[in-house]
Amino acid sequence: MSMNRRNDIDIAKGFALFLVVLGHVVTMHHTIFRWIYAFHMPAFFFLSGMTFRPEKYPSCLDYIKKRGRTLILPYFAITLTALAVCTIRPYYHQAISEYGWKHILKWIFYYGQPQQIYTGQLWFLPALFFAGLYALVWLRIFDRKHIVTRCYALTALMLAGTCIRFADPLIPVMERHPWKLDSALCAAVFLIAGYYTNRTKLLEKMMPYTGFLIPFFVVLSFFFGPKLSEYVNLCDCRYTAPPYYFGAAFSGIFALLLTAKLASLPAISN
């Protein structure tokens, strides 16, 4: 398979990054805010799935070693650097003094989502690490099964991901699962879907119909998102009913990807 960079994927990442910024600028719980949160983080996991190569990892241990170097080590390097800066600088140290070291260290080393040191966005790295691990195991088990079996297995993963917070009372010491293991379940759904979308060249097959599909997916994502649902957040495992959540997420993702693919065409990009 060609190792050349995909311009459409790079453009889609740019669009998704813009939505991240816009999502943090728009007033919380505004309609646009809820619409962006319906699909912008799922889009990043979907895009990661489009470049996912399970054949690179002969075993789960190989995956842990390789992806640990590229995802978990950067998480600690950036987080501990930020923690050092916030400890030294008096202005930034105020939040640490207010919340206490126990709170700060718990969120860094247990939850995998630094708080009060301005690097909370790094939750994506451990979530991507475990989403990839889940996806690798899922593909090892189901990739060669009949498509109906795969659909049932992916549906089961969807339900597990959206219902995982019901297991929180069973955790003896903390309020949630560690290291974004819960967020990674839903993230794995998008990663697997991205993998199959790329492998089957689904986007390429949709391209002749972009004039209809892009506005259709935009309207559909808005309908299943802010129209029918409340605020959702993959990071916090805050979901609505699975048909609404995944309907809004996948519709928004395909609208974004088809727009990016259209923008990557030579006649437009040049």
Q: PLM features: residue spans?
A:
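Alpha-helical transmembrane segments and their immediate juxtamembrane cytosolic regions
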Residues: 1-270
